Amino acid sequence: MKSAKKLLSVLCLGIFILTFTACDMVEKTPEAKAKSTIAKVNGEKIQRKDLDENPRFKQVVSQMKMQYGEEFEKSEQGKEVIKEQKSQILDELITEKILLQKGKELKVIPKDEELNKEADKKVNEIKAVYNNDEKKFEETLKSTGFTKETLKEYLKDQIVIEKVINEATKDVKVEDKDAQKYYNENQSMFTEKPNTMNVSHILVKTEDEAKKVKKRLDAKEDFAKVAKEVSQDTGSKDKGGLLGDINYNDANFDPTFMKAAMALKEGAISNPVHTQFGYHIIKINSKKEYPVKKFDAVKEDIKKQLKQEKQQEAYTKKIEEWKKASKIKTYEKNLL
């Protein structure tokens, strides 16, 4: 199972194209179901087998069975989960089909010799993950539903898709001034070491409750004592409201909470701060702040990050445009 997951982490989604439409007037055999059309994209078919043999879908089903038992697929909840997953993956297969069609239109598909060479290189890179152990590689392929041949075809598709995406985002540029602006607005991301603050808080439901808490603290009552008495955060209440050391760039905390905490000086206690969880009174027990790296030392990294973000935006916009211009028909009844 670990080997299969390792391979699936290397692979994305595969496309295996077949052509046959089963008759809806009779009960379908497994073979007929596999060949039934679940979508058409500009006249090209996506078949049930393409979805059922999709590595990510197979992984989802496997995980569900491990968690909920072998009969999970037969339960009402299981059927709903499977249907939702199939719909999501079908949308991805439709996107891939459009990208492959655009590969022909944009004339970015390499010649067969070059495409095979690139695919073989990727196969060798995957084998290297298994220390070039051919037996283990083949066992993993089998467990994920691939053969050497279908893996190579899948990789050839991915090479074409990558070239289409590169073509669609080739005009994206990031100037030094863009990087400078990002640097100026996100200084805490570029310190010599991560800035941290040791934080305690008291969480209550209403603003009135929070104001009463603040009044008690202003009257010099002990923060930890008040937290143990009134805080509704069960995770920190018994510790006197202590959350511990928090990285300035920690994305696990509410952004409003983080902004308020970072604005406080060491030893300071905030006014009520409203977040999705309620009202907080925040105390900064201590701070560790480090010098900010020079702009020139991080400029290229910032530009690379911003370019990737802009490329993603450009790609998303382009694929939406291509989808709108495509003739797409789905056959939901053939998904189950």
UniProtKB/Swiss-Prot annotation:
Subcellular localization is given as: Cell membrane
Where does the UniProt annotation place the signal sequence?
A: 1-22
Q: Name one GO biological process term.
A: protein folding
Entry function:
Plays a major role in protein secretion by helping the post-translocational extracellular folding of several secreted proteins.
Query: Which SUPFAM superfamilies does this one have?
Result: FKBP-like, Triger factor/SurA peptide-binding domain-like
Q: What is this protein called?
A: Foldase protein PrsA
Report the GO terms under cellular component: plasma membrane
Q: What is its EC number?
A: 5.2.1.8
Q: Which gene encodes it?
A: prsA
User: Could you tell me which residue ranges the PpiC domain spans?
Assistant: 194-286
> What does the record give as the reaction this protein catalyses?
[protein]-peptidylproline (omega=180) = [protein]-peptidylproline (omega=0)
Lineage of the species this protein comes from: Bacteria, Bacillati, Bacillota, Clostridia, Eubacteriales
- Where a lipid (N-palmitoyl cysteine) is covalently attached, the residues are 23
Q: Which InterPro entries match?
A: Foldase_PrsA, PPIase_dom_sf, PPIase_PpiC, PPIase_PpiC_CS, PrsA_foldase, Trigger_fact/SurA_dom_sf
Lipid moiety-binding region (S-diacylglycerol cysteine): 23
